[in-house]
Amino acid sequence: TEILESSTNIVDLGSLKNPSAETLLAEDFDLVIMSSAIVNQVKLYDTLEQAGVAAVYFDIETFEDYKGMMEILTDITGNKELYQENVGEPESIIAEQVKRADGSNPTILLLRAYSTGVKAKGSDTMTGQMLSQLGCINIADNDQGLLENLGMEAILEADPEYIFVTTMGSSEEAALAMVDELLTSNPAWQGLSAIQKNQYYVLEQELFHNKPNNRWGESYQKLADILYGEK
């Protein structure tokens, strides 16, 4: 927000999912950075190429994805010292946190909540992969039904040792209200091992839903502290 308020060089390209090709071309950018995960951004590639505008596409879901992106961008700018600061330093922290896994392989349920629903997420997601690298077993990885149709019966049967919730959208309160409506208000919820042991955690959106970028090490450390005790 501070950057937006202080900058005089911001161009409104429209919405994230529908950027304006006309505005992009009119601004005569040297380089356009786009998301390969957003269909309408991908569709702009041919238009940009034909106009002679350089474009790079990224899909960032894991730290390794972020690392690869930063390597390319710092190669382009020549500012390799920024690579060490924003990638090398968090990478060292991540390596330290991964070593803390003690072989206990705790079982976990990872939920993503938003104002209209709640879904279980597997180890192929950003936070899911972090938990996997820290030695966790995600109960949704081997239960496709849980991913497709979150239900109390399957959760009770698996009885995970830890439950993690990430929220998306502008209102965490609305997202957590939906968790309560669909899950925590059920009397059976209180019988889960994770609840009995106070091992239910709502994770910060800025570190576990949004991409944490140079704070990725902090994300790993927060999870490791929960799982294996604060250092």
Where are the regions a protein language model picked out?
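Solvent-exposed loop/turn segments at secondary-structure junctions
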Residues: 1, 31-32, 37-40, 61-65, ...
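A short, structured surface patch at a secondary-structure boundary
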Residues: 1-27, 31-38, 139
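Alpha-helical, coiled-coil/dimerization segments enriched in small aliphatic residues
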Residues: 1-3, 119-148
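Solvent-exposed, polar/charged alpha-helical surfaces in well-ordered, non-transmembrane soluble domains
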Residues: 22-26, 46, 50, 64-71, ...
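Extracytoplasmic ligand-binding site segments that recognize negatively charged/polar headgroups
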Residues: 40-43, 58-72, 105-126
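Structured C-terminal subdomain patch of bacterial secreted/periplasmic proteins
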Residues: 67-88, 166-231
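Basic- and aromatic-lined ligand-binding clefts that recognize polyanionic substrates
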Residues: 82-134
